Amino acid sequence: MFGALTENSTVPEWEEFLEQIRTETVQSAWITAGYPTPETSWCDEESAAIFDNMNCLVVQDLFRSPLSKRATWCLPAAGFAERNGTWVNCGHRAQTFEQAIRPPAGVWPEGRVFWNLLGRQGLYDPESIRETIAKNSVGFAALSGDIPSLGVDLRLQQFAGT
């Protein structure tokens, strides 16, 4: 949810984001997922109903969900092995990764979609995106330069930088 910031400039938790939608603080959203469970969705019907009155909802996911049924636009998502770039996991560890396989024809990873929407020239370059984020966000400053193979714990880097 890069770009969906709270009043104190932090990224909101999912429940806080849903509350922003309930109060119409947020009226448009691009939700990307990629959860490999077609039998059960990551977003239940009750949570998805909160998005009913949005002006614009883009959902990019591997599988249909209660949320994708409400989308203004539905885009196919690329799986983890079909992307390259930097991930930050739930433990606040940032790691770079390389694409292992090509996505199906017509499927673009989120980064490439954003790259094109921003009017960037040439091929999608996730390293330059990481460098730009590192330069412009104190919380991600540790992502500048080479990243060790085991990644960087962003919490430790923030603590060390204060």
Question: What do these predicted ranges mean?
Answer:
Residues 1-148:
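Non-catalytic alpha/beta scaffold blocks inside enzyme catalytic domains
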Residues 146-162:
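Acidic, Ser/Thr-rich low-complexity intrinsically disordered segments
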